[in-house]
Amino acid sequence: MKQQFAAKHPWTILAAGAAIQVLTGLPAAWGVFQQPVMEEYGLSEQGAGYAFALLIASFGVGCVLGGFLQDKKGPRCAALWGTALLCGGFFAAAFLPGWAGWGFFLAFSIPAGLGTAFLYPSIQSCAQKWYAGRKGLATGVIGGAVGLSGAFLTLFVRAALRGFG
């Protein structure tokens, strides 16, 4: 059934992969998160900078780990772990008390960095495999989604902060 859908609607599958890749651009949208994080957790600009640095470092390490996990267990496993880590980072940060600013590093930066990194190679390699005849286009669509994600997430988060505080 899944194979039939993919065969009949290949561009829908690629669009879904691109939509998922928008989430991997979370580090590119850090600027919109920085001020609310500083206010909520009592972090200085330097402390928020450390949170961002840890997010980026976790992303870098996570790309290697996510690629390894994908080779061993497949892209579905890597994507599920990535989704769980990313969502877990947001949920943990949401329930973290405001006085525990240092906890933000552990609760959000590490799991969100790893989660976005686990998603990145799984979607990219699947696009290249499924669109073997159009690897360049498939890679371009997925890469373009990552590039546009910083702008999209920035606009989305700003609207959400205005609407929900």
What do the predicted segments below correspond to?
Residues 7-29:
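Pair of pore-lining "gating" transmembrane helices in MFS-fold secondary transporters
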Residues 28, 56-64, 151:
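Residue-level signature of mid-helix packing/kink "hotspots" within the transmembrane helices
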Residues 10, 95-106:
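Helix-loop junctions at membrane interfaces in 12-TM secondary transporters
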Residues 62-75:
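Helix-to-loop junctions at the C-terminal end of transmembrane segments
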Residues 145-165:
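Helix-loop-helix hairpin linking two adjacent transmembrane segments in secondary transporters
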Residues 37, 116-131, 138:
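Intracellular juxtamembrane helix-capping segments at the cytosolic ends
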Residues 84-98:
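C-terminal ends and interior cores of transmembrane alpha-helices
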Residues 22, 89, 101-118:
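Hydrophobic core of transmembrane alpha-helices in multi-pass small-molecule transporters
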